């Protein structure tokens, strides 16, 4: 009976440690962007927003116009010309409140109308707040 209790306790400790390690893992954020004029103010706003989360995020930036950026696009299956995509834990779509938000293109109201997405910086901050709340 004592051995069973020790085994059960050991299993509980291992499960607890693995859950704790998972909870501490930073949220992965990947940003594909075009490194030129019209997008630069948006990139600055995104960097400012991401900096609020410190080590709760693991952020990587990929310049659309470089060979590394092209490889990243291929890895993500992107073939179209898009100025900006933000993936949060491997998805460009997040549920923000009751709506699905896709972080593609310029934020609403900024940049050329043709390239505007249907998201705002507030949507991005809210999505990041949600995924980092438990970290």
Predicted regions and their residues:
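Second-shell loop/turn segments in exported
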Residues: 31-37, 61, 72, 109-118
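Non-catalytic, surface beta->alpha helical segment in thiol-disulfide oxidoreductase systems
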Residues: 87-135
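Sec/Tat signal peptide C-region and signal peptidase I cleavage site
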Residues: 17-23
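Thiol-based oxidoreductase modules, predominantly thioredoxin-like and allied folds used
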Residues: 55-69
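Positively charged n-region of N-terminal signal peptides that target proteins for export
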Residues: 1-5
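Bacterial N-terminal signal peptides
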Residues: 7-16
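Local sequence-structure signature of Cys/Sec-based thiol-disulfide redox active-site neighborhoods
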Residues: 24-53
């Amino acid at each position: 009976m004592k051995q069973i209790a020790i085994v059960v306790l050991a299993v509980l400790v291992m499960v607890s440690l693995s859950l704790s390690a998972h909870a501490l893992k930073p949220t992965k954020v990947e940003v594909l962007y075009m490194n030129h004029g019209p997008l630069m103010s948006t990139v600055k706003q995104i960097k400012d927003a991401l900096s609020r989360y410190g080590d709760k995020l693991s952020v990587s930036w990929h310049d659309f116009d470089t060979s590394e950026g092209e490889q990243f696009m291929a890895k993500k299956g992107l073939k179209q010309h898009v100025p900006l995509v933000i993936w949060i834990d491997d998805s460009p779509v997040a549920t923000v409140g009751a709506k699905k938000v896709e972080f593609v293109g310029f934020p609403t109201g900024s940049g050329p109308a043709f390239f505007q997405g249907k998201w705002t910086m507030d949507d991005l901050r809210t999505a990041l707040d949600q995924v980092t709340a438990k970290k």
